[in-house]
Regions:
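Phosphate-binding/catalytic loop of phosphoryl-transfer enzymes
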Residues: 102, 116, 156-275, 389-416, ...
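ATP-binding/phosphotransfer module of carbohydrate and carboxylate kinases, centering on a glycine-rich
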Residues: 1-78, 82-156, 196-197, 263-267, ...
Length: 444
């Protein structure tokens, strides 16, 4: 099992040790070790840090003092006395900077502002307006600034994470195609947000972000090998292998909507939907419910599951039919990837055991190696929390780079975080020159 804290590790640039053998580089690398140890353990004494990091007490004391000056650590009281002098405790300054996670959907855009410990400070939800790429990107920029409005005293923005529907080129930050957002093809979302806010930006597929969210805070917490399956308007999967999202050679991994479960239908063109979404996507289920229920139903999926619970025969048959198709798809995925856990989420997946129990029966019949199959623990927040985590990882790199490069205090500023009155921009690490930063000292 992976360490529960692993998702938030500071980035250790071991190559820097090879490139730069000079004492200054080594001291900065040791400072990163100290920051990571303090963040993992919470309040800790300098003596305990020395034991945990295997650094000498004088070196730890000097590094801690410098990190306190930088604003990355603070003294928070004294340890319980064991008979001698009580040791002063230090803790990580989570409000050194903040991040924004964004869940971009075809109907809503959701935002979360969090400190560097991952604690959510503010949230915002708004309907997705005009789906044209330029208009949506303008809406996101306005949404971020609105999120900051009224947040007096908040630290500067350090990083942004966005979960977008459809295929994404994570390396370049491009949304290759989003079937549920009209006109979205090769949209350079990362470049636009980086230019506007002058901070690093992470872009990924929304289902991959949901997998990250479950890995960080949900029912897949600490499990390095699992699959998150999103069932809703679309059907997709986020695949975690050895603690890393698997995206494939062309960013196509997890596009399970194109799984074909009937060999006689391989010639049929199911379009951008694919076979699986054509049969068990939200629109397909609603159509089938309207046909089967006739005058008894209005096509609403929640009404379908409610009717099945109440013993409506047609509704129960349809739920079993949907679960069977999904069960065969999950069985194929399990046979191929051998995950320890399958998490089912999305709007339809959130119905829970009513869908999962018949789905499990199919998987148990087909597959000899049985994974756990669970409903999402985060509900509709999985994508949003995954976006926050992706931003936190970038923020940790920014903090590490500031130490390694001998920069000033990084993102920290004494001025309140509000949109700049002249430009409307949220201040970030790329706009340090507009702010009075804390007094800093080079690491010893």
């Amino acid at each position: 099992m992976a360490d529960d804290n692993a998702p938030l590790d500071f980035e250790h640039d071991h190559s820097a040790t090879i490139r730069k053998i000079d004492p200054t580089a080594m001291r900065r690398l040791n400072a990163i070790r100290i920051l990571d140890a303090v963040r993992r353990t919470g309040p800790i004494s300098r003596a305990s840090l020395a034991k945990r990091t295997h650094l000498s007490p004088p070196a730890v004391s000097a590094l801690v003092d410098s990190l306190i000056t930088r604003g990355l650590l603070r003294e928070v009281g004294q340890d319980v006395s064991t008979g001698g002098r009580r040791a002063t405790l230090v803790s990580f300054v989570a409000d050194y900077g903040c991040v924004v996670g964004i869940d971009l959907g075809s109907t809503t855009v959701r935002y979360a502002l969090a400190d560097l410990s991952g604690q959510v400070l503010a949230r915002r939800t708004e309907p997705t307006g005009n789906p044209a790429p330029a208009r949506v990107m303008q809406q996101i920029g306005t949404g971020i600034r609105t999120l900051f409005s009224g947040q007096a005293g908040r630290p500067p923005l350090v990083a942004i994470g966005v979960g977008a529907p459809g295929m994404t080129d994570v390396r370049r930050g491009i949304v290759i195609e989003a079937a549920n957002l009209r006109g979205w093809k090769d949209v350079a979302l990362k470049d636009v947000l980086t230019r506007e806010f002058a901070v690093p930006v992470a872009i990924d597929n929304d289902v991959n972000m949901a997998a990250l969210g479950e890995y960080w805070l949900g029912c897949a917490r600490g499990e390095p090998n699992f699959v998150f399956i999103a069932l809703g308007r679309g059907v997709g999967a986020g695949i975690m292998i050895d603690g890393r999202i698997h995206r494939g050679s062309q960013w196509y991994a997890g596009e399970i909507s194109h799984l074909l479960l009937e060999h006689t239908r391989w010639r049929r063109d199911f379009g951008s939907q694919g076979y699986l979404e054509h049969h068990v996507g939200a629109a397909a289920i609603a159509r089938a419910w309207r046909r089967q229920a006739q005058s008894d139903g209005d096509g609403d999926i929640s009404a379908l599951f409610a009717a099945a619970r109440q013993g409506h025969l047609a509704a129960a048959r349809l739920v079993t039919h949907v679960a069977t198709i999904l069960g065969v798809a999950v069985a194929n995925i399990v046979t191929t990837l051998d995950p320890a856990l399958v998490v089912v989420g999305g709007g339809i997946g959130q119905v829970g055991e009513q869908l999962l129990e018949p789905l499990r029966q199919v998987v148990e019949h087909v597959v000899p190696n049985q994974p756990l199959i669970r409903a999402t623990a985060l509900g509709g927040d999985a994508q949003l929390f995954g976006s926050v985590l992706s931003a936190l990882r970038l923020a940790n790199r920014a903090v590490s780079d500031a130490i390694l490069d001998g920069a000033g205090s990084g993102a920290h500023a004494t001025q309140a975080v509000t949109p700049d009155n002249r430009s409307g921009r949220v201040p970030g690490i790329g706009s340090r020159q507009r702010h009075q930063t804390r007094a800093t000292a080079r690491l010893p």
